[in-house]
C-alpha cells in the first residue's frame, strides 16, 4: 500500500500527509491504509479548491490552467494540510475579519463566496451513515458538510453542493480511479474495511451484561461472538462472493451479463383458453342489499334479528326457478336448499321469541351441497403400507384460462364512490406531540377520501363474514348454522343503515389445523342477469327468486331478482386474515404517506394540507392501453386501497409468485428508465418464472395485462 500511495499521489500531498501523521504520532509505514486515506482526503480538498476564483465584481468564476488569474482572489482558503497551530491561526483570522462563528473542530476549507467553513468527507462506507456521523461530531450549522464516496455518490448539507457539476465530476472520477487502481493491486478490500466511524462521545458505548449475552447467543452458526460477526458483515463483498460461488459451479453455468436495452424486454405471454371465472368468497359489484334505515327493532344488532327485519322489507318473492345451472352440480339441491332457508326463516318469525342463532335441519340437499360424508376416509399408513399398488390419487392439472373483461370492471367499480360511509374509526385521543398531529391530519384526510369507497364496503363486508364464519366454525362444529351476510353503514344524512346481502350455511367444521377446510354454501341476492356473462358464473347455480321494483327517472321499473348460490370453502388461516382486512386501509395510507414525505422533503416542510387540498393537481394512477392514467389525489387513494383489497380478496399462490417475480423485471425496467444501464443474465428464466404463475386467476391475469401496458409505455 505504501508503494502505491507514493506512486499514485502528488509528492507534495504525500509529504504533507506524512507530516500530519507524524504530528499525531502515527507511522505511515505501519498505518498504510490511514496514510492512503489522508492522501485521498487532501487531494479531494485541493481539487475542490482548484480553478475557483472570485472576480472584481465578487462573482465566482472558473479559470482553467494557463489562463491569467493574477488579479483574481482564490474562492477557497485551504486549511487542511497545514500544521495545527497555523491552521487555527488561519481560522481565527477568518472569523475575526468575516464575523463567522468559530468552529469547534478544524474544518478543511473556507468559502469566501458563501462565507462558510466547509468540512470535506471521503468515505468507503455508506454515505448517509458517514454524513450523520460528521454532523453529530461537528454539531454546528455554520460548517457546511460535503461528503464524497468511492462509488460516485455525494451528500451535502441541505443538498447544496457548492461547486458546479463538472468540478464535482472531476473529484468523483479521481476517487473512482483510485479505487480501480487499488482493486487491481488487491489493496481495495483491506482499505475499504479499515475505515472507522467518526468517534464521538455519544456513540462510544459498549453492549454489556444481559444484552451482550443475548447478542452472543443470537448469532448465526459458526460465529463465536458479536465482534466476529460484525467483522464478517463489515467485510462482506456480495459481488465477489457471488463470483466466487459461480466459479465453483460446473462449467455449464453461464452467467454472462447481457445489456438490458429498450428493445430487450418482450410482453408477458397471457394464457389462452376459456374466459376466467369469478372466484371471490362473496359477490362484489353484483351484490344486492336488502336494508333497513335507522334500525330500532327489538334485538337490533343480533344478526338473525337484523336479517329477518331486512327480509321483511322485500315483498316481491316468487317461486324460485333455475336460470343458470351449475355445469357439474345437482342444481335441484341448490334450489331445495334456498326453499329450506325461506321456510326456516318463516319458522323463526312464527316463534314468539326469535332465537339468537339458527341451525338448519340436516336435509339431504344440504348434506350434498356441504359435502357431508364426501371426504375420502383416512386410513393409518401402517395399516396399508403393504398394499402393492398404493399411490397418491391423481389430481388434474389446472386448466388455463384467458383474461376476461369482467375483472377490470370489478376493479373500476371498487374504486368508485358509493352514497354511504363505511368507516367508523374509533377516536384515538388528543395529540400530544407535533408528529401525532401530522399523523392524525393525514389519517383524517385519507379517511375522508376513502370512507365512501366501494372497496371500503368490501373490507367491512369481508371482516363481518369471516368473523361470523370463524366464530360459528369454532362454536358449533357439527351444526349447519345459518349465518346472515350483514354490513352496516351511514347514509349521507348520517342515518344508520343495516344491509343484508344474503346467507351462508356452514358445514361441519372440526378444524384442527390452520389449513383444514370448512365447507359452506353462499346464497347472495343480485340484480345481475347471469346470462349476460355466463363464463363469469361458472361455479354458481343461479335462481330467479323474485321481482324488485326500482325507481328510475322514467318511473317505476320491475327487475328480476336473482340468487347466486355456490358451494365454497375456507380455512382458519384464511378467515383469520379475512378478519384483518382493515389492514388494507393502513397499507394504502402508508403508500400515500410515502408520496407526501417525498413531496415534503423536496419543499423542506410538511406538505400534507397542500397535497390533499390542491384539487387542480393530478397524479399518476396506473397504466392502461391508452397510456398513463391520471386522477385527483382522492382517486389515487381509492385506487391504492382497491388494489390492496383485491390482493386480499383474490389471494393465491399464483398472485404471490407473480408479485415476487414480476417485481424483479419491474426493477430492471426502472433502472433502465433511470439510465443506470442495467445488465441481466438468464432473462428467459425470469420470464419463465413469471409466466408459470399466469394460469387461471383473474386478478393475476389483470395485473399481467397492466404490466404489459407499463412495459409498452415505459420503453417508448
From Swiss-Prot:
Placement of sequence motif Nuclear localization signal 2 (NLS2): 184-247
EC numbers: 3.1.-.-
Residue positions binding Mn(2+) 1: 41, 108, 119-120
Cofactor note: Binds 2 manganese ions per subunit.
Binding site for Mn(2+) 2: 80, 108
Cofactor: Mn(2+)
Placement of sequence motif Nuclear localization signal 1 (NLS1): 124-139
Description of post-translational modifications: Phosphorylated on serines and threonines by host kinases, including human casein kinase II.
Record's GO cellular component terms: host cell cytoplasm; host cell nucleus
Main location (coarse class): host cell
GO terms classed as biological process: cap snatching; DNA-templated transcription; symbiont-mediated suppression of host gene expression; symbiont-mediated suppression of host mRNA transcription via inhibition of RNA polymerase II activity; viral RNA genome replication; viral translational frameshifting
Family according to the record: Belongs to the influenza viruses PA family.
Self-association and partners: Influenza RNA polymerase is composed of three subunits: PB1, PB2 and PA. Interacts (via C-terminus) with PB1 (via N-terminus).
Name of the featured protein: Polymerase acidic protein
Organism: Influenza A virus (strain A/Swine/Wisconsin/1/1967 H1N1)
Gene behind the chain: PA
Amino acid at each position: 500500500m505504501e508503494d502505491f500511495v507514493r506512486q499514485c499521489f502528488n509528492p507534495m500531498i504525500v509529504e504533507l500527509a506524512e507530516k500530519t501523521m507524524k504530528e499525531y504520532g502515527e507511522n505511515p509505514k505501519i498505518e498504510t491504509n490511514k496514510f492512503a486515506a489522508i492522501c485521498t482526503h487532501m487531494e479531494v480538498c485541493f481539487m475542490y479548491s482548484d480553478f475557483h476564483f472570485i472576480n472584481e465584481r465578487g462573482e465566482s468564476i472558473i479559470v482553467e490552467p494557463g489562463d491569467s488569474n493574477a488579479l483574481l482572489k482564490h474562492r477557497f482558503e485551504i486549511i487542511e494540510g497545514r500544521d495545527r497551530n497555523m491552521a487555527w491561526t488561519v481560522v481565527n483570522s477568518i472569523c475575526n475579519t468575516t464575523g463567522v462563528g468559530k468552529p469547534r473542530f478544524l474544518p478543511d476549507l473556507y468559502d469566501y463566496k458563501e462565507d462558510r467553513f466547509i468540512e470535506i468527507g471521503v468515505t468507503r462506507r455508506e454515505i448517509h451513515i458517514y454524513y450523520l456521523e460528521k454532523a453529530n461530531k461537528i454539531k454546528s450549522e455554520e460548517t457546511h458538510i460535503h461528503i464524497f464516496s468511492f462509488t460516485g455518490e455525494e451528500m451535502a448539507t441541505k443538498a447544496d453542493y457548492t461547486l458546479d457539476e463538472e468540478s464535482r465530476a472531476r473529484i468523483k472520477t479521481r476517487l473512482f480511479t483510485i479505487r480501480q487502481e487499488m482493486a487491481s493491486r488487491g489493496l481495495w478490500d483491506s482499505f475499504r474495511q479499515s475505515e472507522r466511524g467518526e468517534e464521538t462521545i455519544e456513540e462510544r458505548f459498549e453492549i454489556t451484561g444481559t444484552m451482550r449475552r443475548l447478542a452472543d447467543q443470537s448469532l448465526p452458526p459458526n460465529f463465536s461472538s458479536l465482534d466476529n460477526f460484525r467483522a464478517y458483515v463489515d467485510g462482506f463483498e456480495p459481488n465477489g462472493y457471488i463470483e466466487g460461488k459461480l466459479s465453483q459451479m460446473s462449467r455449464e453455468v453461464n452467467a454472462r451479463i447481457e445489456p438490458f436495452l429498450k428493445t430487450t424486454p418482450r410482453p408477458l405471454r397471457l394464457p389462452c383458453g376459456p374466459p376466467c371465472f369469478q372466484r371471490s368468497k362473496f359477490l362484489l359489484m353484483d351484490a344486492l342489499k336488502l336494508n333497513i334505515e335507522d334500525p330500532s327493532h327489538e334485538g337490533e344488532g343480533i344478526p338473525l334479528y337484523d336479517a329477518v327485519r331486512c327480509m321483511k322489507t322485500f315483498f316481491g318473492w316468487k317461486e324460485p326457478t333455475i336460470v343458470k345451472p351449475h355445469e357439474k352440480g345437482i342444481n335441484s339441491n341448490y334450489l331445495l336448499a334456498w326453499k329450506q332457508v325461506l321456510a326456516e326463516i318463516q319458522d323463526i318469525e312464527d316463534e314468539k321469541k326469535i332465537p339468537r342463532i339458527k341451525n338448519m335441519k340436516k336435509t339431504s340437499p344440504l348434506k350434498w351441497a356441504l359435502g357431508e360424508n364426501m371426504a375420502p376416509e383416512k386410513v393409518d399408513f401402517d395399516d396399508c403400507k403393504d398394499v402393492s399398488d398404493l399411490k397418491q390419487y391423481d389430481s388434474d392439472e389446472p386448466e388455463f384460462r384467458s383474461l376476461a373483461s369482467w375483472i377490470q370492471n370489478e376493479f373500476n367499480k371498487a374504486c368508485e364512490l358509493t352514497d354511504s360511509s363505511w368507516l367508523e374509526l374509533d377516536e384515538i385521543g388528543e395529540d400530544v406531540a407535533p408528529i401525532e398531529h401530522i399523523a392524525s391530519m393525514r389519517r383524517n384526510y385519507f379517511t375522508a377520501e376513502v370512507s365512501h369507497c366501494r372497496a371500503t364496503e368490501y373490507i367491512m363486508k369481508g371482516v363481518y363474514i369471516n368473523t361470523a364464519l370463524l366464530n360459528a366454525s369454532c362454536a358449533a362444529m357439527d351444526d349447519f348454522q345459518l349465518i346472515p351476510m350483514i354490513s352496516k353503514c351511514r347514509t349521507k344524512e348520517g342515518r344508520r343503515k343495516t344491509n343484508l346481502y344474503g346467507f351462508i350455511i356452514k358445514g361441519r367444521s372440526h378444524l384442527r389445523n390452520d389449513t383444514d377446510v370448512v365447507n359452506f354454501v353462499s346464497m347472495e341476492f343480485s340484480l345481475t342477469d347471469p346470462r349476460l356473462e355466463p363464463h363469469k358464473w361458472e361455479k354458481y347455480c343461479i335462481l330467479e327468486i323474485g321481482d324488485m321494483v326500482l325507481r328510475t327517472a322514467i318511473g317505476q321499473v320491475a327487475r328480476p331478482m336473482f340468487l347466486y348460490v355456490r358451494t365454497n370453502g375456507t380455512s382458519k388461516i384464511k378467515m383469520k386474515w379475512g378478519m384483518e382486512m382493515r389492514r388494507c386501509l393502513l397499507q394504502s395510507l402508508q403508500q400515500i404517506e410515502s408520496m407526501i414525505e417525498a413531496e415534503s422533503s423536496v419543499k423542506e416542510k410538511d406538505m400534507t394540507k397542500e397535497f390533499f387540498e390542491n384539487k387542480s393537481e393530478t397524479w399518476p394512477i396506473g397504466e392502461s392501453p391508452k397510456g398513463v392514467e391520471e386522477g385527483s389525489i382522492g382517486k389515487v387513494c381509492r385506487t391504492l386501497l382497491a388494489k390492496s383489497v383485491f390482493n386480499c380478496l383474490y389471494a393465491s399462490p399464483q398472485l404471490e409468485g407473480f408479485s415476487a417475480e414480476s417485481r424483479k423485471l419491474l426493477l430492471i425496467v426502472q433502472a433502465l428508465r433511470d439510465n443506470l444501464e442495467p445488465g441481466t443474465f438468464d432473462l428467459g428464466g425470469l420470464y419463465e418464472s413469471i409466466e408459470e404463475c399466469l394460469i387461471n386467476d383473474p386478478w393475476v391475469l389483470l395485473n399481467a395485462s397492466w404490466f404489459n401496458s407499463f412495459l409498452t409505455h415505459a420503453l417508448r
